[in-house]
């Protein structure tokens, strides 16, 4: 199968640059997997598509202010090297408690062994390695409350298709209301529509909720660079399946209740965990996944999906196509373009079941 088979025309002005004033005011395109029929609805209508006993699984990761601006402390091995140069660092993946992979600009001017100072709260890191693909490995000097300092010093890393600088309000709006575990450099965007009021309403209707954690990396924005779907390889992302969520999913499957995933990150986590379990009940654990889901994949857990609209020829569009059929999904996307739905992170959503 060719990557080009997942292309569609998307006018630039449909890419949402700002969040709506009310995060729950998004439109929702509902797609029936069994018939391919769709309905133009609102996210507020979601309760009407769920049933008592459904298990709604959400990703409780928190986006960290991963974009840092600092100054080089000076190159120790080259006397006279400029010591005041500005450096931009984008944290991409936590390796250990104090070590991170990162993109550094201008990378060629920041060699191994040089330190970078960020702000005036004691946050500093040393470049300890160059990666194969241009990334750097940083080791931060241990400080108390690292993530709290990062919150004050760093900037929210908005996606590359949002053509503006981050603003203070993005610290709230580019987070889900139920975020708990810091570690992502991109939001699990399907969850951005939920409010505490919506979650409470679903609970009143008998819909159960559970949470996984998958820390989203910058790889989610990388374009596909191969021609064949079979040649695609995904980046690794860290996830955690808690005892409570493993038990909730096992119970739902045993009792023939639907498991509804909020977002593709939740789909990938649950389906990866099903692969690990190999036909047995899920067991709580943490690990890394690089699962790639494309048409032909047989879903083991997920029976419903809430997701935003995705990039043309992207692996996430392939996942949605695997879930509901490529032709049906692309037809729904063409309809969404005609009806001027808002696309991508701050955009509208789809419900597929």
Swiss-Prot record:
HAMAP family: QueA. Belongs to the QueA family. GO terms for cellular component: cytoplasm. The gene is queA. Pathway: tRNA modification; tRNA-queuosine biosynthesis. One of its GO terms (biological process) is tRNA wobble guanine modification. InterPro entries: QueA, QueA_dom1, QueA_dom2, QueA_sf. The lineage of its organism: Bacteria, Pseudomonadati, Acidobacteriota, Terriglobia, Terriglobales. One of its GO terms (molecular function) is S-adenosylmethionine:tRNA ribosyltransferase-isomerase activity. This is S-adenosylmethionine:tRNA ribosyltransferase-isomerase. It catalyses: 7-aminomethyl-7-carbaguanosine(34) in tRNA + S-adenosyl-L-methionine = epoxyqueuosine(34) in tRNA + adenine + L-methionine + 2 H(+).
């Amino acid at each position: 199968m060719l990557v080009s088979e997942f292309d569609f025309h998307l006018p630039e002005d449909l890419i949402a640059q700002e969040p709506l004033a009310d995060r729950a005011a998004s439109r929702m395109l509902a797609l029936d997997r069994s018939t391919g029929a769709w309905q133009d609805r609102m996210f507020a209508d979601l309760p009407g598509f769920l049933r008592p006993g459904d298990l709604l699984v959400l990703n409780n990761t928190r986006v960290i202010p991963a974009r840092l601006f600092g100054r080089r402390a000076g190159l120790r091995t080259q006397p006279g090297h400029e010591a005041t140069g500005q450096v931009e660092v984008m944290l991409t993946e936590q390796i250990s408690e104090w070590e991170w992979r990162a993109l550094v600009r201008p990378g060629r001017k920041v060699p191994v062994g040089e330190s970078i100072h960020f702000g005036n709260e004691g946050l500093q890191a040393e470049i300890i390695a160059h990666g194969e693909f241009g990334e750097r490995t940083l080791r931060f000097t241990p400080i108390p409350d690292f993530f709290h300092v990062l919150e004050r010093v760093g900037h929210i890393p908005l996606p590359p298709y949002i053509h503006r600088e981050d603003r203070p309000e993005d610290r709230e709006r580019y987070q889900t209301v139920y975020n708990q575990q810091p570690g992502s450099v991109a939001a699990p965007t399907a969850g951005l529509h939920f409010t505490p009021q919506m979650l409470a309403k679903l609970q009143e209707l008998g819909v159960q909720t559970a949470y996984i954690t998958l820390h989203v990396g910058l790889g989610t924005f990388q374009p596909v660079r191969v021609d064949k779907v079979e040649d695609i390889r995904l980046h690794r992302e860290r996830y955690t399946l808690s005892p409570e969520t493993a038990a909730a999913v096992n119970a739902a499957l045993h009792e023939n209740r639907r498991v509804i995933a909020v977002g593709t990150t939740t789909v990938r986590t649950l389906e990866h965990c099903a692969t690990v379990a190999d036909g047995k009940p899920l067991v709580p654990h943490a690990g890394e996944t690089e699962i790639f889901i494309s048409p032909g994949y047989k879903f083991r857990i997920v029976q419903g999906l809430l997701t935003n609209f995705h990039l043309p020829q992207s692996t996430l569009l392939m996942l949605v196509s695997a879930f509901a059929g490529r032709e049906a999904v692309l037809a729904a996307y063409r309809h969404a373009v005609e009806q001027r739905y808002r696309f991508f992170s701050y955009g509208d959503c789809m419900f597929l079941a």
